[in-house]
Amino acid sequence: MEASTQSGQSAGVWGGLSRQIAETIESVADSIVTVHGGGRSTSSGVVWRPGVIVTVRQGLRRSDSLQVAYGGGDPVQATLVGADAGTDLAVLRVETGATKPVETIGAQAARVGEVVLAVGRSALGDISGSSGIVARLGSGWRTWRGGQIDSLIRPDVQLYVGQAGSALVNEGRRVLGINSTALARNAVITIPAATVDRVVDAILERGHVPRPYLGAAMQAVPVPEASRAQFGEGVDEALLVLHVEANAPAATAGILVGDLVLSVDGKLVHNVHGVQRQLSTLKVGDPVAVAVIRGGVKMELKVILADRG
């Protein structure tokens, strides 16, 4: 009798959980679309605002032949407003449909261990879902392409074919963010709603996310041993300026071909990635000190960072 009671209770728990998962997926299904990104490429997309769909940049192959499909309906044309490699996000606009945006929630409401669902659509438009937990939460970070992510959300979910760009949904039927497989090796990262909002705002306003640049092509070269002591401890490599783009911030500041760049904003740089990493901490319009060696003399130039556009 006791075993029968326990079995019945277990069935009740699993039945309740199963219904809750199915109902949660159904509750957001009208806001999830299939994105046909050109060729055979498909991904999922999320209705973020009326007429505005957010998907992942990695799923777009051609910007001139984009379509989105709602459920089993016929695909409709979509226009690429802009895409951001730094965060792997792309913003599409449609003239029909996309009338039911998702309800979002901030990453601060998430808890490690809570059950979450990745909700997307297949290439045929069928709703798809996978479940897991929030495996890790963390503070803001920068992607390998220089994008600023407001907080780390790493779910333990498997994304099936077409689920890149899917929504990560919590038990309250709110969307924590957009799922991407392009920001970390062999891992799903959820781009939090705050980051998505910021990128969408920038793209709708400017067509891109503004990021500062110098406008100089450089290559790492060793600093002669005889000069290392003269230019400071740790200066064993510098960046040789090979080309300066006309009217770029570097040109305006007086950086010349042949200069050796030692540091940017007070930080030694040993390779181009070091420069990009340092620039990613700054904003368009910021003044930045660039230390160079010219003709054996160390000097510091003030560069006003601009938007590459």
Q: What kind of feature is each model-predicted range?
A:
Residues 1-12, 23, 40, 49, ...:
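C-terminal recognition in membrane/secretory proteostasis and scaffolding
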Residues 9, 32, 38-128, 153, ...:
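Conserved active-site neighborhood of the chymotrypsin/trypsin-like protease fold
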Residues 15, 19, 107-110, 128, ...:
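Soluble non-cytosolic domains of exported or imported proteins
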Residues 25, 43-46, 166-168:
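His/acidic/aromatic-lined binding-pocket segments of jelly-roll/cupin-type domains
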Residues 29-31, 90, 95-103, 128-186, ...:
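Active-site region of chymotrypsin-like
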Residues 37, 121, 139, 180, ...:
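Short, conserved catalytic or interaction motifs in soluble domains
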Residues 51, 113-119, 168-173, 250, ...:
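A structural signal for short beta-strand/turn segments enriched in small hydrophobics and glycine
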Residues 86, 139-143, 175, 220-227, ...:
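Active-site/binding-pocket entry motifs
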